Amino acid sequence: MANTNSAKKRIQIAERNRLENKNYKSTVRTLMKRCFVACGIFEKEPGDESKADLQKTFNLAFSKIDKAVKKGVLHKNTGANQKSRLSVALKKVLKEVV
């Protein structure tokens, strides 16, 4: 139990930051899953519309990962690893379709 007011405030701030970071990480994971689903859709039905949706989804995921790294929510190596996984999946799908 915190004794001083400053310690109590730090507990509140830490909890607030924990929840914000949790939300951010959850969003990144959700966007990554959407990317993999979009890859599957594009693989089954290649077309201009599904390719545009695929690019849009990947751009959004890359942006969110970069922002998470910038804010310190994710370590830079973790962000790079996630972006690499997405890139490999994208290149694999585009290579198979072409």
Curated annotation (Swiss-Prot):
Protein name: Small ribosomal subunit protein bS20
Gene Ontology cellular component list: small ribosomal subunit
GO molecular function, one term: structural constituent of ribosome
UniProt-listed InterPro entries: Ribosomal_bS20, Ribosomal_bS20_sf
Role summary: Binds directly to 16S ribosomal RNA.
Assigned keywords, A-Z: Ribonucleoprotein, Ribosomal protein, RNA-binding, rRNA-binding
Membership in a protein family: Belongs to the bacterial ribosomal protein bS20 family.
Listed GO biological process terms: translation
